[in-house]
Amino acid sequence: MNELHDGESSEEGRINVEDHLEEAKKDDTGHWKHSGTAKPSKFRAFIRLHFKDSRKFAFSRKKEKELTSEDSDAANQSPSGAPESQTEEESDRKIDGTGSSAEGGDGSGTDSISVIKKSFFKSGRKKKDVPKSRNVSRSNGADTSVQREKLKDIFSPHGKEKELAHIKKTVATRARTYSSNSIKICDVEVGPSSFEKVFLLGKGDVGRVYLVREKKSGKFYAMKVLSKQEMIKRNKSKRAFAEQHILATSNHPFIVTLYHSFQSDEYLYLCMEYCMGGEFFRALQRRPGRCLSENEAKFYIAEVTAALEYLHLMGFIYRDLKPENILLHESGHIMLSDFDLSKQSNSAGAPTVIQARNAPSAQNAYALDTKSCIADFRTNSFVGTEEYIAPEVIKGCGHTSAVDWWTLGILFYEMLYATTPFKGKNRNMTFSNILHKDVIFPEYADAPSISSLCKNLIRKLLVKDENDRLGSQAGAADVKLHPFFKNVQWALLRHTEPPIIPKLAPIDEKGNPNISHLKESKSLDITHSPQNTQTVEVPLSNLSGADHGDDPFESFNSVTVHHEWD
């Protein structure tokens, strides 16, 4: 996928290098000249590929003017008063061709790049035209003979092919850093055989999730293994690409972290952060009454709102919010997972800053309008969990990002009352309740005590008409500016102690959970040998010999996302 590759024009870089390697020739002086068919900017692109890290090289603009002058007497004169060195920033600007002109620049000493650059563009220059003053040096006075030899090797017949292959590999694997500057995508060798299974965490209709240990580092991960055959059979192939893309491009504390993705002949693999707290749904089941107090629920709803805001800013609609898809980090904070039902807008817009007329506090007076990022995006897919499906999805009239705010209201209600507001005896009754019934807040003796602001927020999130629903006009800004969240410090959510702190397994000396108390599942095919089990299980070794013809997963890229905190 193009989105996972380097944002720079790597193809253009490759073409330029090949052109110059073919056109570069050696003249009688032992220097290098060019055929004159390429523009100077192409040479700069070539030089940057080789000397990207050599920031101490400097150009002498006055020297360059003299060396390229037709008057040989002027060329033989040495510049006076030239500074000994040049700052790294000035050198970089001149390598880019964005520095001062030859007429207006200050002399600063020449180097091997200057000489090659001038002889490279001076096509047809003969030996007698070459100035006698050829004593070149680095700005710091060091000898450049090593650099000369390196460049000669580059342009030698044997060096051309070798260096071109090296440059292609460098350009292809150049790291992409996202706007947050905290994650990069790099090319590394990792595959199913790099991990060993430990335990089965869960399973679905097209795959399973395992706790795995990386053999090299000993770190634990959650490995999602998806069957290609089942995805094709159930027409869910595109969902794997959507999930990989969202996970690989997202960088948010409340969204699960992706580390590796790759494939074998039979399976797709998504290697993600192992959330030791498990499913949020399980944590709710262990609470008294299987529910939370209003203040406890407010904390988690605020974190989910922040995660949805980020997804909408990225142009994604989540569409599958429910307790089972929320994981608990070991710190107790939530992490959204399972993005296979998510949808991305093809024409995501830019967010706008809005000011609330009746802001609950000065710190919440301004917010980002996330609706503007996906304002014109509608989809007609009938997806979601039955009790969480929005009315517009049931009607089949298409839906927008407003469905995420409907599901947020259902989730909030379930946190407080341990049930969903429109649940019926069967699917048809549930859908009928969603379409026609208003939300009811129980008032029995042991019913939770809920404030009027809390009820007001839930009612506004569960408005049947998506155009009148809270969040339909300005997205997350509408929700965050509701008076119920008056005292929430959104920027400090990650540093607030959660109501539920998971009880974790003991930690070993390497900081990994001690899982010696867990019994290995008999369904796991650790030996990868069919003779040892009658149940066909997912192997974690690369399968071979399968011939799928037209493979719809051919473009499922192998990606490793490196995080700065690793």
UniProtKB/Swiss-Prot annotation:
Signal peptide: none
Modified residues (Phosphoserine): S381
EC top class, as a word: transferase
Alphabetical list of Gene3D superfamilies matching this protein: Phosphorylase Kinase, domain 1, Transferase(Phosphotransferase) domain 1
Domain (Protein kinase): residue spans on this chain: 195-485
A cellular-component GO term for this protein: plasma membrane
Annotated Polar residues bias: 74-85, 134-145
Alphabetized UniProt keyword annotations: ATP-binding, Kinase, Nucleotide-binding, Phosphoprotein, Serine/threonine-protein kinase, Transferase
Active site (UniProt): D320
Binding locations of ATP: L201, G202, K203, G204, D205, V206, G207, R208, V209, K224
Chain intervals with Basic and acidic residues compositional bias: 1-31
Disulphide bonds in the chain: none
Its EC number(s): 2.7.11.1
The reaction(s) this protein catalyses: L-seryl-[protein] + ATP = O-phospho-L-seryl-[protein] + ADP + H(+); L-threonyl-[protein] + ATP = O-phospho-L-threonyl-[protein] + ADP + H(+)
UniProt biased composition (Basic residues): 119-129
Annotated segments matching region Disordered: 1-39, 60-152
PROSITE patterns documented for this protein: PROTEIN_KINASE_DOM (PS50011), PROTEIN_KINASE_ST (PS00108)
GO biological process: phospholipid translocation; signaling
GO molecular function: ATP binding; protein serine kinase activity; protein serine/threonine kinase activity
Phosphothreonine: residues carrying this PTM: T379, T385
Stated family: Belongs to the protein kinase superfamily. Ser/Thr protein kinase family. KIN82 subfamily.
Protein name (Swiss-Prot/TrEMBL): Serine/threonine-protein kinase ppk14
Organism: Schizosaccharomyces pombe (strain 972 / ATCC 24843) (Fission yeast)
Gene: ppk14
